[in-house]
């Protein structure tokens, strides 16, 4: 969770994913209460899914999931992407 608006965190998430791999798709939609953006990509042949959800006008929740090419999750790289997003948000 980041105390920044959705658009700012979305741009930081794109930069973080581009640092380690490639973005393959992005989308935006609204739920009943929140605006949501998603990113999908590849990092070291692992699939990445990011959900960036504005929970309030000034707070955003980011969920990162990674699946390795052999099927297991890659928690280390998912955590590294979360940390990179935080670094991208640092002034």
For each feature predicted by the language model, list its residue ranges.
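Ser/Thr-rich, low-complexity intrinsically disordered terminal regions
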Residues: 1-91
């Amino acid at each position: 969770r980041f105390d920044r608006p959705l658009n700012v965190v979305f741009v930081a998430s794109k930069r973080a994913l581009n640092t380690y791999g490639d973005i393959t798709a992005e989308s935006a939609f609204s739920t009943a209460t929140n605006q949501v953006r998603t990113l999908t990509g590849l990092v070291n042949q692992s699939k990445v899914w990011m959900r960036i959800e504005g929970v309030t006008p000034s707070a955003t929740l980011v969920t990162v999931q990674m699946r390795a090419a052999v099927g297991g999750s890659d928690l280390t790289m998912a955590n590294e992407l979360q940390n990179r997003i935080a670094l991208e948000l640092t002034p």
